């Protein structure tokens, strides 16, 4: 994928940035594509960098993701909770699986979706092969993760754990309006809500 370069005029002449580095200057992190350990490490590094720059200023995490590895997503989530800077989440396109979980984990009152975005929640997926004992160990672990994710999603949405558990048994797709009613987001936006962004 070709990453666009942005050229800016400064007092010392021209300076060029890749588009993601330029967005980072405005405290915007873009999470696009599947979530794996490499993606998680990049997002976490950006969160920690922005926290060090100004722990009181909002960070804006734009999400367009089909989800991915649970442990990688949880690493991002835990870092969002760990830092002092509030993290606003904005769904553009889709936030599915771990993407939806991260969307719900943004700062209360600052979780958004664009009009035509879709959000999908479901139980964690897993596959393992090997000895029966190892399969049993992994099955227990995925059930533990499922309970943990359901409890956290219930906490962020205001839904009961029982409702979340029932809804995540299969893929549960929502429009922005449905996600708002569910409690995953706080508002649907048609205009930029990021202070300092292009309105």
Swiss-Prot record:
Protein name: ATP-dependent Clp protease proteolytic subunit
SUPFAM superfamilies: ClpP/crotonase (SSF52096)
Self-association state and partner proteins as the record states: Fourteen ClpP subunits assemble into 2 heptameric rings which stack back to back to give a disk-like structure with a central cavity, resembling the structure of eukaryotic proteasomes.
Organism: Geobacter sp. (strain M21)
Keyword annotations from UniProtKB, A to Z: Cytoplasm, Hydrolase, Protease, Serine protease
Cellular localisation: Cytoplasm
Function per UniProt: Cleaves peptides in various proteins in a process that requires ATP hydrolysis. Has a chymotrypsin-like activity. Plays a major role in the degradation of misfolded proteins.
Family: Belongs to the peptidase S14 family.
Entry GO MF terms: ATP-dependent peptidase activity; ATPase binding; serine-type endopeptidase activity
